[in-house]
UniProtKB/Swiss-Prot annotation:
This protein's record includes keyword Cytoplasm: yes
Membrane spanning stretches: none
Official protein name in the record: NADPH-dependent 7-cyano-7-deazaguanine reductase
Entry-linked HAMAP family: QueF_type2
Lineage of producing organism: Bacteria, Pseudomonadati, Pseudomonadota, Gammaproteobacteria, Enterobacterales
Species whose genome carries this gene: Klebsiella pneumoniae subsp. pneumoniae (strain ATCC 700721 / MGH 78578)
Source organism superkingdom: Bacteria
UniProt enzyme class: oxidoreductase
Reactions catalysed: 7-aminomethyl-7-carbaguanine + 2 NADP(+) = 7-cyano-7-deazaguanine + 2 NADPH + 3 H(+)
Residues that, per the record, bind substrate: V88, E89, S90, H228, E229
Entries under InterPro entries matching the protein: GTP-CH-I_C/QueF (IPR043133), NADPH_dep_7-cyano-7-deazaG_red (IPR050084), QueF (IPR029500), QueF_N (IPR029139), QueF_type2 (IPR016428)
Keywords: Cytoplasm, NADP, Oxidoreductase, Queuosine biosynthesis
């Protein structure tokens, strides 16, 4: 259980509740969650964040009607800046997108502008939206996270309760610059406790991080209840606090749910996240 899973900011969410699906446009379906909800306990404040970054969403189930009533389909790419006051709750995002299904729009640009306006209002930040026709994406290869995978270690684990203490004393010795990857990240939805599966890329420069300790730390998220974005910020904050690298970037790509995948990244250096879906996305 997290320290804030009964917080009043979560009380009005449709997540975890029986919901009617609407197929005509309704921007009021979108619901935001204050980023401060998990940042305050971590000692992170909007005016002095130790990182920059964004939440990258892929919208796989996006459809509307053109001016003549002919259905249109697209794949959407959305970026919410880490500086927005709110993150967008994913079930509300899905319900909102469903409301486009039987709504007529004059053009693709109108759809993109509507998404940009509504998501920016919900997040209280400047959101970027791009729409892609299917033939623009056909033949696109499966992407991979660059780096050394740390998953094949011959270690025994019997504790799956979250603990940042696994990182205590994890960094020592000479300064290195490396990128590590794990596909074993699994956390749970803050409200429903349904599993969230992800791959995480950690790029840093600093004292070498012990890979066994890092893997034990990542595996300890297995019973942890937080939203995707919150988990990435926690990982960044914990590594920065315990390992004190000169530079650090954390990027996670989660499997899709409800036609959406969420891919947050946070960095205090020069980092450009690779886009493109992974094998499990």
């Amino acid at each position: 259980m997290s320290s804030y899973d009964n917080h009043q900011a979560l009380a009005g969410l449709t997540l975890g509740k029986s919901t009617d699906y609407r197929d005509t446009y309704d921007a009021s379906l979108l619901q935001g969650v204050p980023r401060s909800l998990n940042r305050d306990p971590l000692g992170l404040h909007a005016d002095n964040l130790p990182f920059h970054g964004a939440d990258i969403w892929t919208l796989y189930e996006l459809s509307w009607l053109n001016g003549k009533g002919l259905p249109q389909v697209a794949v959407g790419h959305v970026e919410l800046p880490d500086t927005s006051l709110n993150l967008v709750e994913s079930k509300s995002f899905k319900l909102y997108l469903n409301s486009f299904n039987q709504t007529r729009f004059a053009s693709w640009q109108d759809v993109a502008e509507t998404l940009t306006r509504d998501l920016s209002a919900c997040a209280q930040g400047k959101v970027k939206v791009s729409l892609y026709r299917l033939d623009e994406l056909e033949g696109q290869p499966i992407a991979r996270l660059h780096g050394t995978c740390i998953d094949d270690q011959d270690i025994e684990i019997d504790n799956y309760q979250f603990s940042a203490d696994y990182l205590q004393g994890a960094a020592s010795g000479k300064i290195v610059e490396e990128t590590l990857v794990s596909h074993l990240l699994k956390s749970n939805c803050l409200i429903t406790h349904q599993p969230d599966w992800g791959s995480v890329q950690i790029q840093y420069r600093g004292a070498k991080i012990d890979r066994e300790q890092l893997l034990r730390y990542l595996v300890s998220f297995r019973h942890h209840n937080e939203f995707h974005e919150q988990c990435v910020e926690r990982i960044f904050n914990d590594i920065l606090r315990f390992c004190q690298p000169e530079s650090l970037s954390v990027y996670a790509r989660y499997t899709r749910r409800g036609g959406l995948d969420i891919n947050p990244w946070r960095s205090n250096g020069d980092f450009s996240p690779a886009t493109g879906r992974l094998a499990r996305q």
